A protein has these predicted regions:
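N-proximal low-complexity "stem/linker" segments adjacent to membrane-targeting elements
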Residues: 1-29
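Membrane-interface aromatic/basic loop that binds lipid-linked glycans or pyrophosphate carriers
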Residues: 2, 272-336
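Cell-envelope/extracellular polymer assembly enzymes that use nucleotide-activated donors
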Residues: 8-11, 39, 190
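Short, acidic, metal-binding catalytic loop of nucleotide-sugar glycosyltransferases
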Residues: 28-37
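A conserved acidic beta->alpha catalytic loop
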Residues: 44-53, 73, 95
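Glycine-rich, basic loop-to-helix element that forms the pyrophosphate-binding segment
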Residues: 70-86
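Donor-binding/catalytic cores of nucleotide-activated saccharide
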Residues: 75, 79, 96-203, 210-227
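Short aromatic/hydrophobic "clamp" motif used to bind/position activated sugar donors
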Residues: 91
């Protein structure tokens, strides 16, 4: 297929690093999009497998696929390069081990244009060899325009940048970019927070349009060595929020709770030694924020104080629990 448009309606960024296992399935699903005015920017981050050859094959058949080769510098740097390259009115991101429904970008684009959205979002499936499970985040309003700052449930979703469609001009105006720490993971955490913080018009559809693969052993979420990446992301979030000098919005009151949701999730995926290392760093961070009064603007919840107290005084108890829900259940009992 040959593109006959100068400026695409949507640019889709596909950050790739040693992605050969599922990449063809991913790119095939993109090629089948019902939206024709679309470009697919594949950023090859120094892959050492057949990733580049697979992308080149798709490019020969369909010049809407664009290959960018670069030395390995990480996920965030790859996506920033994609953002700088994209010509589309809106920008989407698809991970190379996921795949999408044929009408995903047509539906999100139509929704974004109709309601003049900064961010349009879809529900999605958790995908594994056993099948698909719908993930619709019931606490988030569907098919209605909201301001995320006035609807905190938007922030409580997983980062999942790949379920969103972003207005390109809005991204550029707000100078939204990913952290570029080489070798890091979860660099969508701070980006997603900043995007929702800056957005004034957000809408989520209840249509599940993307299949998020949860059983890829190569996924960074399973990398036990990347213990502290979420801390770097949350340092970026705190720096961003305090730079805005905003003190009177509900989100500020919830900031610590949102942080601890992320930390508890990270704790749950680590092995025993990783838990000990992470809790120690969490402890040091809590002491730093108290000492420097970086949390003086936050009306911290009781749950926050309980969690912080456990980190300070009884981390061994916290290490017994691997799942966020189990931890929260225990803490609520202690609070009563």
């Amino acid at each position: 297929m040959s593109s006959n448009f100068k400026f695409p309606k949507v640019s889709v960024l596909i950050p790739c690093f040693n992605s050969e296992t599922f990449l063809s399935e991913c790119l095939t699903s993109l090629q089948k999009q019902t939206l024709q005015e679309i470009e697919f920017i594949c950023i090859n981050d120094g892959s050492m497998d057949s990733t580049q050859l697979i992308i080149e094959k798709f490019h020969k058949l369909d010049n809407r696929f664009i290959l960018i080769n670069k030395n390995n510098s990480g996920y965030g740097d790859s996506l920033n390069l994609g953002l700088d390259t994209a010509k589309g009115e809106f920008i989407g991101i698809v991970e190379p081990d996921d795949f999408v429904e044929p009408d995903m970008f047509a539906l999100l684009y139509e929704m974004a244009v109709q309601y003049n959205l900064d961010v349009a979002r879809c529900s999605y499936f958790y995908h594994s060899k056993y099948g698909d499970t719908e993930q619709k985040w019931p606490s988030v309003p569907k098919n209605v325009v909201v301001n995320p700052i006035e609807c905190i449930s938007v922030f409580k979703q997983g980062p999942s940048v790949w379920a969103n469609l972003y207005k390109n001009s809005w991204l550029q105006r707000n100078k939204l970019r990913f952290l570029t720490t080489p070798g890091a993971s979860y660099q969508d955490t701070s980006f997603t927070f900043k995007a929702y913080f800056c957005a004034r018009k957000f809408m989520m559809t209840d249509h599940c349009l993307l299949h998020y693969r949860i059983d890829n052993e190569k996924s960074s979420v399973h990398d036990k060595k990347k213990i502290y990446c979420v801390i770097d992301e949350w340092n970026e979030i705190y720096n961003f929020v305090f730079s805005k000098q905003i003190q009177d919005i509900p989100l500020i009151e919830k900031l610590a709770e949102l942080q601890h949701r992320t930390y508890l999730w990270n704790l749950g995926r680590l092995d025993h030694e990783g838990k000990k290392k992470f809790i120690k760093e969490w402890h040091l961070e809590a002491k730093y924020r108290r000492r420097t009064k970086r949390t003086h603007l936050l009306k911290l919840s009781l749950l926050h104080f309980i969690i912080e107290g456990m980190i300070l005084y009884c981390p061994n108890v916290l290490m017994l629990y691997n799942k966020e829900l189990a931890i929260v259940r225990i803490l609520k009992k202690l609070a009563n």
